[in-house]
Amino acid sequence: MSELANYGPGAIRAAYSGDYGFRTPPPDLPSLLLNERIVYLGTPINDVVAELLIAQLLYLESEDNAKPIEIYINSPGVAGFETSAFAVYDTMRHVRMPIKTICLGLAGGFSALLMAAGTKGQRMSLPNSRIILYQPYGGARGQATDINIRAQELLTTKRTLNQLLSIHTGKTVEQIDKDTERLFYMSPQEAVSYGLIDKVLEPSANKLAKLKAVGAPV
């Protein structure tokens, strides 16, 4: 079992005092981030990761269902059953607080869907990230009938994924089907044009000036 399983709301409650702040320093970095209403997805999505993300979202809603949260995403997509990612997506749509999503590094496949599922106007990416859309994939073993059942399930998953992407991007399902026949890479600016995100987070003018002053690439 991944050590991520230790980073749930139970760890938060152990250090939390009543309704006001931490009595002691948070027991781990994810708890510290959670105290600031920040959720970080930095691995492929599997059952354990999905369980953690869902628990964090529900916990934050129970804390304050109107106060915004931020989800930072650096993930290639699903490593396991696609139902784990759909469960996270459905939870994001279920909770009532505004959700800002920020891609840093990579948002691929189902992780790109989670990025696009943030609150409109609050879906963002850092400038050097990459976004990839691709079809669900998977292998199947066993009897021919079992392999056929799995193949049909993959087609159903693909159809559902593309329908959800269509909702969040404004693209037609047919267009997304065509675009994802092969790996479909996008820069953050291209992702804005595609409708996956709303803006690219560029360095501030002051920060750019400091970087140029020390000869750093910008």
From Swiss-Prot:
It catalyses: Hydrolysis of proteins to small peptides in the presence of ATP and magnesium. alpha-casein is the usual test substrate. In the absence of ATP, only oligopeptides shorter than five residues are hydrolyzed (such as succinyl-Leu-Tyr-|-NHMec, and Leu-Tyr-Leu-|-Tyr-Trp, in which cleavage of the -Tyr-|-Leu- and -Tyr-|-Trp bonds also occurs). The keyword Hydrolase applies. Its EC number is 3.4.21.92. It is found in: Cytoplasm. Keywords: Cytoplasm, Hydrolase, Protease, Serine protease. SUPFAM superfamilies: ClpP/crotonase (SSF52096). It is an enzyme of class 3 (hydrolase). Gene3D superfamilies: 2-enoyl-CoA Hydratase, Chain A, domain 1. Pfam families: CLP_protease. One of its GO terms (biological process) is protein quality control for misfolded or incompletely synthesized proteins. One of its GO terms (molecular function) is ATP-dependent peptidase activity. One of its GO terms (cellular component) is endopeptidase Clp complex. Belongs to the peptidase S14 family. Cleaves peptides in various proteins in a process that requires ATP hydrolysis. Has a chymotrypsin-like activity. Plays a major role in the degradation of misfolded proteins. Fourteen ClpP subunits assemble into 2 heptameric rings which stack back to back to give a disk-like structure with a central cavity, resembling the structure of eukaryotic proteasomes. NCBIfam families: PRK12552.1. This is ATP-dependent Clp protease proteolytic subunit 2. It comes from Gloeobacter violaceus (strain ATCC 29082 / PCC 7421). The gene is clpP2.
